[in-house]
Amino acid sequence: MLTNHHVIAGADTPGSKVQVTLNDGSRRSAQFVASDVNTDVGVLKIDDANDLPVMQFGNSDELRVGQEVVAVGSPLGLSATVTSGIVSALNRPVRASQGGGESSLMDGIQTDAAINPGNSGGPLVDRSGNLIGMNSAIASPVSYTHLTLPTKA
């Protein structure tokens, strides 16, 4: 399972166990696999995941400004929340706070699809439901400026 490093930073020791909540509300145990503070990407291995669906990856290199996208997440603990918008810009440099310091995340996708605290690590998908990015940062205090890590960088 892909997520953001900042989402699992407290469990970033190899073999650490966490609980993940799926869209249907069920909970599964997962094990920390790896994460990278510089790209804000984390990987978990969900136990007994054979029956879980797998998202298809889209090609973020094929995105165009104005293209419709959908962000999925759990803002404020409200699970399986979906918001829609467009790709506002491509190749935006993203800076995200990481453990008291800052790390640069280059080539982000800017979207006006609402991404709020709790959406981090959730997917940004195209109209066909293909994964094109991972919700990562909000450019505060500016409203409606949301940044996503592309699937292909």
Regions found by a protein language model. Give the residues of each.
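A short, hydrophobic C-terminal helix/tail in secreted or cell-surface proteins
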Residues: 148-153
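Serine-dependent protease modules
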Residues: 1-147
